[in-house]
Amino acid sequence: MKTPTPLAVEQIPETLPKTQAHERRDSWHDVLVVGAGPTGLACAIEAQRAGFNAIVVDKGCLVNSIFRYPNNMVFFTTPELLEIGDIPFTTALAKPTRLEALEYYRRVAEHYELDIRLYEWVKTITGEDGDFRVTTTNRHGAIHDYRARKIVVATGYYDLANQLNIPGEDLGKVFHYYREAHPYFDTDVVVIGGKNSAAEAALDLWRHGVRVTLVHRGAQMHSHVKYWVRPDIE
């Protein structure tokens, strides 16, 4: 997974709208970033470096998508491609693990003392360039209102599961995300898919005593399956 290059920080006007005159200064932010993943953090860092007041809001935990990856996942890429903010990412082996990535991004957030509001759902964004209004709700039901000159949407795509749109897909025994094999020991599991995620999940399940059937629509696994995974799955 290669972290996208942060968005360029646009020029932000030095003066605030007149409607802000009677409000507390700390209720305003130059930049509000929606999403506390690697890209969102990188955007906040670049805004902060440019001298702007940035805040990050996320409905989940820090780098929530990485947290939800399979527990024992190892990235396909090397650590330097995951670095942000000029903070070195050192790992025990050639490729970082999920746990190493979580620790790294926590360290980055602490180093830059980023203003991050976790477990806050963005409910509405209104207004216009230079004067946006953002309403959020936290996990306790409290409502918060923010105003910002610029908005960066860095929500990613991990929440958008690949749907088959077939009968039975909404049953309780059907899952679109995989965490670990242990709960499925000595059971029958069908994995649907022909790319890396499906291949790695099927192999992990099989290696932990699960009876696995891998279903994919092609005559063979997709060409995108990594070369070091393919021999074991085929």
State the predicted function of each range.
Residues 51, 231-234:
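Short, intrinsically disordered, charge-balanced linker/junction segments flanking boundaries
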